[in-house]
Amino acid sequence: MAHRLVNGMSSGKEAEFSMVEKMRLKLEFQYVSKLNRMLKDVAVSKELADKFNHFLAQKHLSLPLVFDIQVFASVNFPSSNFTNLQLPTLLQKCVEIFEQFHNTTYPKRKLHWLHNSHSRGEILSNCFKKPYCFKATTLQMTVLLLFNSLDTYSIGELAELTKLGINSLLQVLESLIKAKILITGNGEKAVDLTNDSVISLVKEYDNGRLHVNIASPTK
């Protein structure tokens, strides 16, 4: 259920509550109670998003991109380890404005950003022959947006610019290499890359689809 709710795959509030009611007859009270809290969290998150939009209008603030935020209680939703990440400037601005709103509204609550798990976005390209729209993880977008400035980076440079740990960075690069958007300088595999290894943008990238989901595992 957590995966469906966080990723917007739910069939609707009524359907989810109906499923929980059916589970009530078969499962322990604590488990069913947690499911109910998760559903309430989703409703509260939507209300918070509405309040944020009102805050933006009231302060005459505009965001540089479409920014969809979900806030859940950590006790109700399982979460993975937090990843250190230097966000792209445009996204960082959105985060800072939301934190300003949230800290003012709920001064006793602390936000932990899960960039490495359910965080997703869409990025439009204008550097290839076709105008692709890539659905990517926040980590993938952070790396790809660096190639607006240069066509080639060393692993060490990418690590410094993104602040990602080397293991996380290599996983991201491996996914982008498999997607044939990036390429290694000497045809190295991700496991063989070093700080001095070179990663370049594949300017000849070609795909039959204009909307490409690179957030999913590449076969």
Task: Show where each model-derived region lies.
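Eukaryotic scaffold/interaction segments
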Residues: 1-219
